[in-house]
């Protein structure tokens, strides 16, 4: 049996930023004159699994896709939802129907107009039967979404339609206050009608067509993803950075050293041991902000014994979350629910044992472990699969130690490169 650690993101966003260190080209205005930033070099922690917005599922891809595409709506720096390709929208009084009016100035990078049909096509692609999208569930508020993806309804019954070239209508089966936020995510991005047939369309600049502030200029896996400003972007006049480069550096210390050497302008993978020293060394450059994200362990429920609820409860109870975030040491918060704290308007359920003492929690973990049929004479044995990178290794080693110490479980650690991790995790 196997369980795996998600590598999508952590509960707290963390970065070092030194925009003044960006490469600005030749100084044509003499010494002492501040030059505009024309390029940006970012550490990305790894290569994207894909740049197909319908199939992307990792933070490495999401970082790049936000530059390559623009959704109907987008997020402002303060987290609020603001117009994107849609100039405005109306929501019916019952909260079930959204009507979006698209800007006629929105163009694809090849010059074609971005239409309501392109957005409808992207959403239908995600929810088509047999879809491999890991984030299709985010679109389940759409009318008949579950029925369509499970082949119980035809795709034309899905709650999305283009009324005309510049008007998109979306219908929900029940009100969903968060739905506008979903539409800012890659899973709801438009798809050009020439894309989607082959994977190379999303990896080769010769085929790639996007509608964002940047175009794909080069992708050398394991080396760099280079983007160039899209002159046809609807708001190109306000895009001052001409080139953005993403470097897939797996080792966080290597990435930090590149940042310190001036070879990167942003790094978001600070090694745990360096967090406090860096806050003292570069207080103006360390940025910490809440992030709508979760670091979690995914279980393979298709086979025994991980399909036994009592065993899953034992594994969860055995984790000392307070200790875990202390070991990781980058300002994360313990996660006691699926939705992180701080989400506006959300008051989620919490474990009833959240405030137990460590001894009480471990006692309940052992009780659940015994009730699941395991003990010292019959210990649980399983494999924990995790992505490369010292954060993930730290978490994996800590979890394995906790399960062994509290329950007596025997854990085999299996570290895999990110792409191989994606290909072999099912």
Task: Please annotate each region the language model reported.
Residues 25, 367-426:
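Ligand/substrate-recognition segments at binding pockets and active sites
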Residues 36-49, 87, 97-100, 119-122, ...:
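Short, well-ordered beta-strand elements
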Residues 43-93, 124, 131, 207-210:
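N-terminal lobe/hinge region of extracytoplasmic solute-binding protein
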Residues 115-122, 165-171, 212-213, 241-243, ...:
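Alpha-helical secondary-structure segments
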Residues 143-145, 151-156, 161, 166, ...:
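Gly/Pro-rich hinge or "lid" segments in bacterial periplasmic/extracellular proteins
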Residues 217-228, 245-303, 326:
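Extracellular/periplasmic solute-recognition and catalytic clefts
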Residues 333-372, 389-394:
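Structural transition elements
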């Amino acid at each position: 049996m196997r369980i795996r650690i998600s590598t999508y993101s952590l509960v707290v966003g963390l970065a070092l930023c030194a925009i003044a260190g960006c490469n600005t080209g030749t100084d044509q205005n003499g010494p002492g004159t501040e030059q505009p930033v024309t390029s940006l070099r970012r550490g990305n922690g790894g290569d994207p699994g894909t740049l197909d917005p319908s199939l992307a599922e990792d933070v490495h891809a999401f970082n790049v896709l936000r530059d390559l595409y623009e959704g109907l709506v987008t997020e402002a720096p303060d987290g609020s939802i603001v117009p994107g390709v849609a100039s405005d929208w109306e929501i019916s009084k019952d909260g079930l129907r959204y009507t979006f009016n698209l800007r006629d100035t929105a163009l694809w990078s090849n010059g074609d107009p971005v239409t309501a049909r392109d957005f409808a096509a992207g959403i239908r692609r995600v929810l088509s039967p047999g879809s491999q999208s890991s984030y299709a569930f985010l679109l389940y508020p759409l009318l008949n979404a579950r029925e369509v993806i499970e082949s119980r309804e035809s795709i034309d019954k899905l709650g999305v339609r283009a009324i005309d070239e510049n008007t998109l209508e979306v219908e929900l089966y029940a009100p969903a206050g968060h739905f506008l936020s979903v539409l800012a995510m890659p899973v709801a991005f438009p798809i050009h009608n020439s894309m989607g047939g082959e994977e190379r369309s999303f990896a080769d600049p010769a085929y790639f067509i996007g509608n964002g502030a940047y175009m794909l200029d080069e992708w050398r896996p394991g080396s760099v993803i280079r983007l160039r400003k899209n002159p046809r972007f609807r708001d190109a006049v306000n895009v001052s950075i001409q080139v953005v480069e993403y470097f897939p550096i797996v080792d966080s210390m290597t990435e930090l050293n590149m940042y310190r050497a001036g070879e990167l302008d942003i790094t978001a993978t600070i090694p745990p041991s360096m967090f406090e020293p860096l806050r003292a060394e570069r207080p103006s450059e360390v940025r910490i902000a809440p992030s709508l994200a979760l670091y979690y362990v995914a279980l393979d429920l298709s086979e025994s014994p991980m399909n036994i609820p009592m065993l899953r409860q034992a594994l969860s109870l055995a984790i000392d979350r307070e200790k875990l975030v202390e070991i990781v040491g980058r300002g994360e918060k313990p996660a006691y629910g699926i939705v992180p704290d701080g989400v506006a308007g959300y008051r989620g359920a919490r474990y009833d044992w959240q405030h137990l003492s460590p001894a009480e929690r471990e006692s309940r973990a052992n009780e659940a472990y015994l009730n699941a049929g395991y003990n010292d004479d019959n210990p649980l044995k399983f494999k924990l699969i995790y992505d490369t990178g010292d954060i993930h290794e730290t978490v994996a080693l800590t979890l394995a130690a906790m399960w062994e110490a509290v329950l007596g479980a025997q854990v085999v650690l299996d570290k895999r490169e990110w792409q191989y991790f994606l290909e072999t995790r099912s």
